[in-house]
Swiss-Prot record:
Belongs to the cyclophilin-type PPIase family. PPIase H subfamily. It comes from Neurospora crassa (strain ATCC 24698 / 74-OR23-1A / CBS 708.71 / DSM 1257 / FGSC 987). PPIases accelerate the folding of proteins. It catalyzes the cis-trans isomerization of proline imidic peptide bonds in oligopeptides. Its EC number is 5.2.1.8. Pfam families: Pro_isomerase (PF00160). InterPro entries: Cyclophilin-like_dom_sf, Cyclophilin-type_PPIase, Cyclophilin-type_PPIase_CS, Cyclophilin-type_PPIase_dom. It catalyses: [protein]-peptidylproline (omega=180) = [protein]-peptidylproline (omega=0). This is Peptidyl-prolyl cis-trans isomerase H. It is found in: Nucleus.
Length: 182
């Protein structure tokens, strides 16, 4: 693996170590666009590092959580570390969700990190990684990062069979075994 070089922008780099069915799949490294969407980037960063605490003061975040929804030629969705099925969400700001920061960045390439939501101003812990350009999501979902290394891992995730446990649910668990900041 090549040494990690921090972006000239000063934006943070975070990583996910992914397993598929309990077997190591590889690492995905993301640049978070703190320079454009600082609140959204910080929310994700703290869930990667475990800095965020729940109302009982316990760390909460992506480590050990699953990608609960995978749709080939579209995206891989995760971030529900509360329920593991897409029904749970929270944020670092003391509320269940926070407002859309802005829509300056577009869904114009594969490998973008974007907020999953339930409508306007409902951003929380859930996110998705695009596997193709998705311009129909522009103005509806906040882009806040991109894959800088490990798109091959995202493609392996995208090719995971689904349907046995639900329409878009992976047949084998796709898990964020470890995560953090570079």
């Amino acid at each position: 693996m090549a040494p990690t070089v921090l972006p000239a922008s000063g934006n943070p780099l975070v990583f996910f170590d992914i397993t598929l069915g309990g077997e190591p799949l590889g690492r995905i490294t993301f640049e978070l666009f703190k320079d454009v969407v600082p609140r959204t980037a910080e929310n994700f960063r703290q869930f990667c590092t475990g800095e965020s605490k729940n109302n009982l003061g316990r760390p909460q975040g992506y480590k050990g959580s699953k990608f609960h929804r995978i749709i080939p030629n579209f995206m891989c969705q995760g971030g529900d570390f509360l329920n593991g099925d897409g029904t749970g969400s929270t944020c670092i700001y003391g509320t269940k969700s926070f407002a859309d920061e802005n829509f300056l960045l577009k869904h114009d390439t594969p490998g973008l990190l974007s907020m999953a939501n339930a409508g306007p101003n409902t951003n929380g812990s859930q996110f998705f990684i695009t596997t193709v350009p998705t311009p129909f999501l522009d103005g509806k979902h906040v882009v806040f990062g991109k894959v800088v290394d490990g798109m091959d891992v995202v493609k392996k995730m995208e090719n995971t069979k689904t349907g046995y446990r639900g329409k878009d649910v992976p047949n084998l668990d796709v898990v964020i075994a470890q995560c953090g900041e570079m």
